[in-house]
Amino acid sequence: MTIAFQLAVFALIATSSILLISVPVVFASPDGWSSNKNVVFSGTSLWIALVFLVGILNSLIS
């Protein structure tokens, strides 16, 4: 169970880092938002799911 928690936390940190870099790049590019809207929404949905997963796994470990 601890390994699953550590992997979920690592995935959350990696997704946060990727979104931290990619979202400003998408907004700064001339046609970025209209062409990459689905990618940003998918990344945000993944991030929200990982936040809940880490919370659930944390409650099972503690």
UniProtKB/Swiss-Prot annotation:
InterPro entries: PSII_PsbZ, PSII_PsbZ_sf. Keywords: Chloroplast, Membrane, Photosynthesis, Photosystem II, Plastid, Reaction center, Thylakoid, Transmembrane, Transmembrane helix. It holds the Pfam family Ycf9. GO terms for biological process: photosynthesis; photosystem II stabilization. It is a multi-pass membrane protein. Coiled coil: none annotated. Its main location: plastid. The chain crosses the membrane at residues 8-28, 41-61. It is found in: Plastid, Chloroplast thylakoid membrane. GO terms for cellular component: chloroplast thylakoid membrane; photosystem II reaction center. Disulfide bonds: none annotated. NCBIfam families: PS_II_psbZ (TIGR03043). May control the interaction of photosystem II (PSII) cores with the light-harvesting antenna, regulates electron flow through the 2 photosystem reaction centers. PSII is a light-driven water plastoquinone oxidoreductase, using light energy to abstract electrons from H(2)O, generating a proton gradient subsequently used for ATP formation. PSII is composed of 1 copy each of membrane proteins PsbA, PsbB, PsbC, PsbD, PsbE, PsbF, PsbH, PsbI, PsbJ, PsbK, PsbL, PsbM, PsbT, PsbY, PsbZ, Psb30/Ycf12, at least 3 peripheral proteins of the oxygen-evolving complex and a large number of cofactors. It forms dimeric complexes. HAMAP family: PSII_PsbZ (MF_00644). Belongs to the PsbZ family. This is Photosystem II reaction center protein Z. It comes from Lotus japonicus. The lineage of its organism: Eukaryota, Viridiplantae, Streptophyta, Embryophyta, Tracheophyta. The gene is psbZ.
